Amino acid sequence: MSWQQYVDQHLVATQCVTMAAICGLDGSIWAKSNGLELSQDEVATLARSFSKDEVLAANGIRIGGTKYIYLSGDDKLIRGKKDRQGVHIVKTKTAMVMALYAEPILPEQCAVVVEKLGDWLIQNDL
């Protein structure tokens, strides 16, 4: 299965994710939803930001030029929100699974889908 199929079939097709991407920890973009504008700089900055609460709280989370308010996170997870939209990012051994959602999707719905794929990737050393 290609990375694009993971984005399309395991994230967006669930209807619990509006747009998604899978990116390398080096900032490379492996697959993304149509219409999701990402820069390698944004992705690389996010990859370096896990477990840096003070940096994320001060600077927010930038995806596609949009700044999201940092809500919470740890060494494998980052959560953010802006108005009626949000972002949920899971770090695996080699990648980040990044998902955006908008109302009426609930943050918890997005989280379950993203974390399930993230857990599967971790179990498979990806």
Swiss-Prot record:
It is found in: Cytoplasm, Cytoskeleton. Transmembrane segments: none annotated. One of its GO terms (molecular function) is actin monomer binding. The keyword Secreted does not apply. The keyword Metal-binding does not apply. Keywords: Actin-binding, Cytoplasm, Cytoskeleton. InterPro entries: PFN, PFN_euk, PFN_sf, Profilin_CS. GO terms for cellular component: cell cortex; cytoskeleton. GO terms for biological process: regulation of cellular component organization. Signal peptide: none annotated. Belongs to the profilin family. Binds to actin and affects the structure of the cytoskeleton. At high concentrations, profilin prevents the polymerization of actin, whereas it enhances it at low concentrations. By binding to PIP2, it inhibits the formation of IP3 and DG. Occurs in many kinds of cells as a complex with monomeric actin in a 1:1 ratio. This is Profilin. It comes from Branchiostoma belcheri (Amphioxus).
